[in-house]
Amino acid sequence: DVLRGLRNEGFQPFMVCQTRVRAQDKREFTKHLIRMRPASEITGEDVNEVILLNSHDGSSGFQLLGGVYRFVCQNGMVAGETIGEVRVPHRGNIVQNVINGAFDVLDGFDLIREQKDGMKAVTLDRDEQYAFARSALALRYDPSDTEAPAPVTESQLLAPRRFEDRRDDLWTVFQRTQENLTKGGLHGRSRSGRSMSTRPITGIDQNVKLNRALWMLADAMRQMKS
């Protein structure tokens, strides 16, 4: 009913994923993440999205967030906490409340564009790029855990996966770092010193938390450089 109501208001789902659960009786009630786009945000190099999170077991209500999807790398980002987040409990007129929440997130798209354009206008030198990557590593791996240092380096996070990502603007550096952190596949060393490959982040909560933190890190650097 919620999806039907959102579709009727012009929001189209483009990606759905769900949390893996071991308990069979929880499987149909697991948390879902749905990335939706209004008709005005269908085309472009990157598009703004409304992200809908829901857990059907009643443990949490609906959560709506703003996000950006970048087509060239099929990368989905989540905007920082300064951009509207709407929570809708599983009570009352749920469908209408979720629709209202989606339009509230839509109102925040101008701020997303402003921050995104600001990042594209900022150029980072080599030291600044490494400082950004170092801070990003600390979001993913606990820097205080001396027994389990980060298995990869700043230079690995900054390595572009495609030619067009070799630019030095903050937005592109942010994209490279985010993609390498979340998609995994980087060769490194485990705690015991054995060769390993980093795993992609598949958990919904962990993915959203890291993505929001990375956005806030990038926006903080944008403000420092402005």
Residue ranges and their predicted role:
Residues 20, 39-226:
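Intrinsically disordered, low-complexity regions enriched in serine/threonine
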Residues 17-41:
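Accessory recognition modules or surfaces
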Residues 1-17:
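Amphipathic alpha-helical segments
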